[in-house]
UniProtKB/Swiss-Prot annotation:
Forms stable complexes with CPN60 in the presence of ATP. The keyword Zinc-finger does not apply. PROSITE patterns: CHAPERONINS_CPN10. This is 10 kDa chaperonin.
Amino acid sequence: MMKRLIPTFNRILVQGVIQPAKTESGILLPEKASKLNSGKVIAVGPGSRDKDGKLIPVSVKEGDTVLLPEYGGTQVKLGEKEYHLFRDEDVLGTLHED
């Protein structure tokens, strides 16, 4: 049975982009360089509400590649895949191809 997680409030479900352990030329990278620091947004919550009850939407959308803090988020395992839940304000930025 396939499970689908839909985040609540201003939370974002991210699948980590695994950084390679070595460069294309064969140089081994330190373990810290391969930690989760970017990910693909899989799902987003509807947003949060301000003090007047007005909806504040999440700043990213499904499919975006985002820059994440080195620590934080909540690890979630669905089936064989691992994801992380972050709050919208924890995302450091979005990454774009030139």
